[in-house]
Amino acid sequence: MKDNILKRSFHHSKFENIKELVKLKEKQDVKISLAFPSLNEEKTIGKEIIIMKSELMEKYPLLDEIAVIDSGSEDETVSIAKEYGAKVFYSSDILPEYGFYKGKGENLWKSLYALDGDIIVWVDSDIENIHPKFVYGLVGALLNYPEIGYVKAFYDRPIVGKSAMQPTGGGRVTELVARPLFSLFYPELSTIIQPLSGEYAGRREILEKLPFFVGYGVEIAHLIDIAEKFGSEIIAQVDLELRIHDNQPLHSLSKMAFELTKVVLKRLEKYGKLDLNTELTDKHIMIQKKENEKVLVPTEILSVERPPMITIPEYKEKFSKEEKV
């Protein structure tokens, strides 16, 4: 195994001195942006914004901007985000000439254009136990270690039931799909504890050179692309202890597993590790029970890939202008 990312694992408490992080940020003369990709998260988005804004902008000026990148929420997500002082962007309004896909990866890709930071932090908008550590833990690793370019969060993920909480068992797709595939083809990446976690941060000069799958495949593709283009040595991980959120039902996890497997197979072929000799289907076939019989339920799951943002002329023009100012 070429690398062991466990060696670059930190506990969030190592970076809890936010005053020191602000000093490092000012010394390095960098801007830091936080983005929440969202779709119908009215129950949690307000609390997330309040906590991050009050602690990491008003009390300590660690963050330069907080934004919500929305896929077209039909609830009160957008109005709540605006009320509590976040910048709000509809993903469909960012670089509209390139079209719009509904998906988390699309929001992340578009956020690179919308946000100004040299360091970008992405945090999912459905976290029930939100805490400033979800940001300063990730940012702290980047500010303290210039050789690190991309930081993933890890944590315990309990399964929340109607009447009780199982302390472990979340992250099922990681253990059943991602880790076995990494063990086979990228063993160094199998040492990432939560490779599919939705909380991570990176340096713009890394992120802008990565393609983005528009759906759930974005995280796993990032890790493979980073390992191939930059080396896994720039990846670190931070222990945030616990993340509580609504767990996905099994049929949703099945769709996610299909998409992740397809993305990994595409990457294996791209990097010459596998020759598929076949066209991968977009149709995921599930079997469900209706009344007293089993029926096939085919679902189309596209694996659309956005190019590296650095290849987009509008992006290059915007950020070359900012560099000259």
From Swiss-Prot:
(2R)-3-phosphoglycerate binds at G171, R172, V173, T174, N247. Optimum pH is 7.0 (at 60 degrees Celsius). Mn(2+) binds at D126, H245. Inhibited by ADP and EDTA. Optimum temperature is 70 degrees Celsius. Keywords: Cobalt, Glycosyltransferase, Magnesium, Manganese, Metal-binding, Nickel, Transferase, Zinc. It catalyses: an NDP-alpha-D-glucose + (2R)-3-phosphoglycerate = (2R)-2-O-(alpha-D-glucopyranosyl)-3-phospho-glycerate + a ribonucleoside 5'-diphosphate + H(+); (2R)-3-phosphoglycerate + UDP-alpha-D-glucose = (2R)-2-O-(alpha-D-glucopyranosyl)-3-phospho-glycerate + UDP + H(+); ADP-alpha-D-glucose + (2R)-3-phosphoglycerate = (2R)-2-O-(alpha-D-glucopyranosyl)-3-phospho-glycerate + ADP + H(+). Requires divalent cations for activity. Its EC number is 2.4.1.266. It comes from the Bacteria. UDP-alpha-D-glucose binds at residues 37-41, 71, 104, 124-125, 216-219, 243-248. NCBIfam families: PRK13915.1. Homodimer in solution. Belongs to the glycosyltransferase 2 family. This is Glucosyl-3-phosphoglycerate synthase. It comes from Petrotoga mobilis (strain DSM 10674 / SJ95).
